[in-house]
Amino acid sequence: ERHLQRFKYSGRWGLQPAHDRLRGEIEAELDAPLPPGVLELDSALEIPAYFASVDIHQHPGGIWSDAIAGYVYERGARSTTPLMQQHKDLHWKFTALVNERRRGSRILDMGCGFGKSTRPFWSENRDAQVTGVDIAAPCLRLAAQDAAAAQARNVRFLQRDCRKTGLPDASHDVVTSTMVIHEMPPPAIRETFAEAMRVLEPGGLMIHLDFIPPEDPFMRFMHFGHGRRNNEPYMEPMVRMDVKKTMRELGFRNVETIDFEEMPGALAARGERWRFPWTVVVGEK
């Protein structure tokens, strides 16, 4: 698994060399003019040491250090779960679940990356104002271009740290993330939850989609092994921390974790294939 991922990105015919040959065209595409207010970058933003110290997913140089990194990362993500492409995308399924619980009017997507998790929110909630924040400028540039190409008028992307977004107190009614908190060490997760509490209005909803394997030795062996092979060093510490206890300590109410069915039959008692242990983490202010 580790070597396959490395070759996928860095091999002779890997994603990085292939896109390096198209660098000029890609950079021109990412530099295309945008409507006012869609993208706000901060060149002075300090990249957290926990994030800069490891090439997450073995992405060469990380997804923040190269102008075309977001473009390459988006292409790489397409091959992560190919068997799921015959079903409704899990991001759209997750958005539907969030909307069932709370159809927000001011939605914050933390760690939005290249915008795949954000798109269903601004697409399905046309009357809402959606904000995506991330520390990786290359990803945000792609997210903004995709939104502009779709003529979206209710979304903006900001280069901010999830732990310190700089957004006003009580300014959102839904705060969400998808596959983000397992990329953070426990202290950063706690800070991110605290920031969500700060920017949520009273009664607001915090809801994250991530991975929490069941209390089964083999399942945890498989999950933690994947994390080690794929340069995801915080996957195991995140699982071992008491996420629900942390949320309650920060003041969240009605805290729960829910198994998430990413495609039909995924939660069957005897599945045919190993799967990521998709879990929804929920709390209210």
Residue ranges of each PLM-predicted region?
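A short acidic, Gly/Pro-enriched loop at the edge of an enzyme's catalytic core
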Residues: 163-175
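N-terminal auxiliary segments of SAM/dcSAM-dependent transferases
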Residues: 1-64
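A short glycine-rich, Lys/Arg-flanked "PGG" loop and its adjoining helix->strand segment in the class I
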Residues: 190-202
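C-terminal alpha-helical "lid/dimerization" subdomain adjacent to the S-adenosyl-L-methionine
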Residues: 207-267
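Conserved glycine-rich SAM-binding loop
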Residues: 113
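Class I SAM-dependent methyltransferase SAM/SAH-binding core
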Residues: 108, 116-164
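Conserved alpha-helix/loop element of class I SAM-dependent methyltransferases that forms part
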Residues: 72, 85-103
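Conserved SAM-binding loop and adjacent beta-strand
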Residues: 65-66, 77-93
